[in-house]
From Swiss-Prot:
GO terms for cellular component: host cell; host cell endoplasmic reticulum membrane; host cell nucleus; membrane; viral capsid. Disulfide bonds: none annotated. It comes from Murine polyomavirus (strain A3). The chain crosses the membrane at residues 287-307. This is Minor capsid protein VP2. A motif (Nuclear localization signal) lies at residues 311-319. Pfam families: Polyoma_coat2 (PF00761). Isoform VP2 forms homooligomers, and heterooligomers with VP3 in the endoplasmic reticulum membrane. Interacts (via D1 domain) with VP1. Residues 306-319 are annotated as: DNA-binding.
Amino acid sequence: MGAALTILVDLIEGLAEVSTLTGLSAEAILSGEALAALDGEITALTLEGVMSSETALATMGISEEVYGFVSTVPVFVNRTAGAIWLMQTVQGASTISLGIQRYLHNEEVPTVNRNMALIPWRDPALLDIYFPGVNQFAHALNVVHDWGHGLLHSVGRYVWQMVVQETQHRLEGAVRELTVRQTHTFLDGLARLLENTRWVVSNAPQSAIDAINRGASSVSSGYSSLSDYYRQLGLNPPQRRALFNRIEGSMGNGGPTPAAHIQDESGEVIKFYQAPGGAHQRVTPDWMLPLILGLYGDITPTWATVIEEDGPQKKKRRL
């Protein structure tokens, strides 16, 4: 409302100032007659080709601001009058409808739900006043009732997953320990077997030559025994028994051993010595020690040097 009054005051002051400058009356400006007269003069001057619209306004002594005010005021007045008429119409219709409603309104006392039972209102915090903490306890029971099933399901699933994971870890650890234990047992048995085995150093080519020589000698001895058989065929049984007794007696008295009883060795047998002093400790020759320690997982300094020399060389880090 204050803004509308301010606009009206500014409009009145502008009308008075424009009327003084141009000599036009306020009624002519508000009705639009002044604008029509100015447009007619400007059109006449521009059609003759003498000057433009701005020059015509300057010739008549009217500035562009004054001409804009004269052309805007009639439009503003018409719109304001229409708005006021619409507001009066709406206000009149509202007054008429209000009077009709008051005339048709029934002011009797309603009888709907007159016999309905009424429940007295009680403050929800009344129980908490009489029994402090009962509302919190009821809320906790409600939470447990609503969330109990889901909570038990989640906890049970978590416990089951923990049991499965722990069982899997325990089984993996037991299997790993059993595998390591069996491997150590096997390697320990293999090491003890190598320690107690009879070792022989042999030369394979020389052994083959010796075997061929023994075969040739056995063939020649077969032919010689056949000739001896035919040569000794004339001996009678008593003579043969006497000869056998004489040969057996010579063997029992440390005599020469027949060639058939001589066992040829395929190589040089390595002699193992026990621990001195009867300590009953495990003894291993020096040449077998790296093998035994390797089976037990230990590496001697000599082997470490060999592995470091023969293994891949580490690349030098570039600076």
